[in-house]
Amino acid sequence: MAKLSKALLERLGVAAVTEHANKSETTLRANIPVGDKGISFDGEIEVFKDDTESVQSLIGRVPVQVKGTQVQEFTAGNRTFPTGMDHFQNYYNSQGVIIFVVEIKRNRESKVFYKQLVPTEIHGILQEYGIKKGQGQRRIELRPISETDLASVCIKFMNETKKQPLMLIENKPFEREDYTSYEMTSLTFDPSIGNIFEHDFTLYGVKEKLTVPLDHFRIDALKSEIIETIIIDGVSYELFIETTNMEKEVILLIENSLELNYTIGTSKFDFKLKRLHSLAAQLKVLPLVLDLLTGRNVEFVQLGWTFDLSVTEKEREMSKTYKRLYRTMLQLKEVFQQLDVDETTEFGDETIERNKFINQIDIFNKMMLEDDRSNFKVEFPEEAKYIGFNIGGMKFILFYDPYSKPIFTNAFSQNISNKRISVIYNDVETPYTPYTLFDSQSLVCSCNVNITVIKESFNRIDPFVNDEVAYISNDFCLTCIHAFDLSQNEDFLELADYIYSKYQGDTLTPEILYINQTQIKKRREGELSEADVHRLFSIKQEHAGDIGMNFCTSVLLESKVEAKLLFDKLSREEQERYKAFPIYKLYYDMTATVLV
């Protein structure tokens, strides 16, 4: 290919850009001299409101650089071009530039490509590739002008650069959490015709009327959530799917469990069980998997996909494995019904190897459905007791009785709550509830805990009948308050309040009872009534010498400095004891940011 001279390429390049300016419906005036170029910039394009080209009609000026390059054939799609870091710095200092690369054939035909370089993008290039990586140049990607028009390119550039003052880019005046909203813009993306993965975007943080440029990026993936209908050989499944769309691949996460990968343009897909997630998820996806392994045709209705399926020997073997897993999950469904556990409860920790995880479920099923404890060790197996069992992150509380059938039962079933348990005090046996044996962690973390059953168990006893029983009941109420602090489940506050409502005697110190009831109210409502404040103040006056009681009232009255002074007066042992009480949570939250 005979080479054209650099001077000719320059003239032809400028002429091609000028021709686009002259043909624009919006009045553009290209001031791009030939042979007398400045440093980094070749000239400018003026944009006018009308064709008078008067002072009054001038909208603005766009700095430009034009590069002519000879080619044998025009580039299809986008093309790249190298630019030095020193030029990037000059572009940044001048608030951006539009670069034109004009491909020119031997016969003088030309094709114009453009790149709008705005300050946020240039700043990122200088920081990442110039300063951090020490590169001397960086290739930029240019788009064909034929996909748009020069006036639109210039006007969008001017509007975008106005939103990107260098002071905001460099100083980052706010933290991310300070912005009330975010907005995203693109100079080139047209949703009706464009591939979003081929375009650049700028992210702005919005604070009141100010928009602050935060980042310039290209989208790698788009996530969305849909309810999809999948039809396999006429059998229909309606499933929740998280879709991740990438330039060449789509990943579906079905019911947070089954991952399906499809390479765009092919006729096949792969799938795997990424995680178990929950029993509900498995009861939905495993029948789907079995049909995928044995079916002939599958249609994804909303996505518009249709695939022909084939059954290989490998898939037949996989089908056997998934059938066993499905049987295991159906058995677990029966166990969950016994334990009154929600099937949508997530299994939680799935970091252990998949087969070991499933083995845990098999052991649990055999314990609950077959009284088989051969794979579960019970200490002192001759004694009836409450025991715990874990599946991943799920925790269950069971009642174990070696002399009954079944051996393992739900600790919160009506049969268990009716079992006789007693508190012996001064040789007097008093009927009591078994549920005060559980600590706050067990109440919060065990997925078969039934607060209604616990509450009803207190209806069959007097929880404050004597000093010992009252002490246990009060301690359990504090456990319930702590359980609320761990979980934010207000049912625990209601349970504690309900138990306290049964108090009628003289087995508790009235002031302690009132402080604990006020703790519940403080957590529920966030504030106290005027009557509460007066009552707490009276308690402070009546018990001026009781440091612990004064500490509690000061916390509830939000006397931050006084509460800290009183806590510091407690002995080290007393401080450790109070740290285990729910009142300390209120104290800690109140004083966490207070310096004394």
Show where each model-derived region lies.
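Charge-rich interaction segments
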Residues: 140-257
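Short, hydrophobic/proline-enriched secondary-structure or compact coil segments at domain edges
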Residues: 101, 265-279, 473-484
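Catalytic centers of nucleases
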Residues: 4-82
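General N-terminal leader/first-domain-start detector
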Residues: 1-21, 161-176
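Long, low-complexity regulatory tails in eukaryotic proteins
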Residues: 301-596
